[in-house]
């Protein structure tokens, strides 16, 4: 038996690299459920085993009593689904079938997981030898830190979601929002308690970051109630597993469903709504919802659902509720399809609290520039809106991908908090507080760059006339050098028979 490795360092990447050998010819979108399902199975097995051994040590014979586990929000794992059984079958041709049966048994014993877990490990195209090797890897690494709610499996699940998003490109938009974007929404909204809602929740990232925020600030996760839904059945299942790993109780509806046509929470009035809806969604069914009660500020156009999502969220706001959402930049200024009028009505209703223009290249899934919209039913700064131009923030972590740093996120959150407190001073090129009347004078366009102005450049102290004289001299020298090089190139081309 290999020695158990309890180190957290690089564990997420280790799991990912090992699991990648399983892929073979399976599409990334299908393979995702295999990898994440296996992580989930190991997680619930480890939690169950820890409690099981605790009950054995007590000596009262309650180790097979299901109630002992459910009382502590631990999933009960029947005998044929325990990791010892999986591990023993790792190097047999039946390993896929054994895992599928384990998943079915766990679903049967835990109603919350009914029809959620993947049961496709026996498929012929999944290499059983490699599957056994990954099972071995999981067997030899302890996946939870006992007594610590911030377990390594949650991080691994999150890491693998990000890697799948990177692989799937545009398709990943259905289930993944970059962590730094979600953290920015959460740090601004600060959802300490109340009802938290995401109408297009993907894999549940908004809820996970909310729980992390609460933990980091010494709060209690039980002080929030989580509601969400998603129209993609695979993504909906990913969210259920993701939240279960984190110990987050959530109502995501009884099944996946279209938010516009089958609202799973029609009576909900939420305190915090966070979402990253599909950008510029066309063909969303506007013609069948023309008289919907949610369109208080105007009927959204058929070819773009951005303001349908926005108004759906406003409809679900509690009297003191707040929204933080991601929208494509077109929504800041578009006049087509009545969008300008809808935006005008929302602004005049004094709902727009803050707009943040985000940097480019934050998403694996799209190059469309985006902004964060923060709305509030009962704004503290009446008749005013904060504009933040954060386009220059962030650091390139790969050639194609940018991330906001902790410092960047905190700067945005601190700026917003100062605005709410009434202590913020405008900063040229970064932030400005603007009255609704001034926004009206700009035809209700919400592009931050229009209001924050251009960052002031430090004066280097060199007199203008001297600077221009120096620069024109340098330019003249460069022109002269250019002519010399041009003549030399012509001469060399002529020497080999190519005259210009």
Question: How does the language model describe each region?
Answer:
Residues 269-270, 304-306, 320-322, 326-328, ...:
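Active-site lining segments that contact anionic ligands and/or coordinate catalytic metals
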Residues 14, 21, 30-43, 236, ...:
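Conserved Class I SAM-dependent methyltransferase catalytic core
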Residues 124, 146, 200, 228-232, ...:
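Hydrophobic alpha-helical scaffolding
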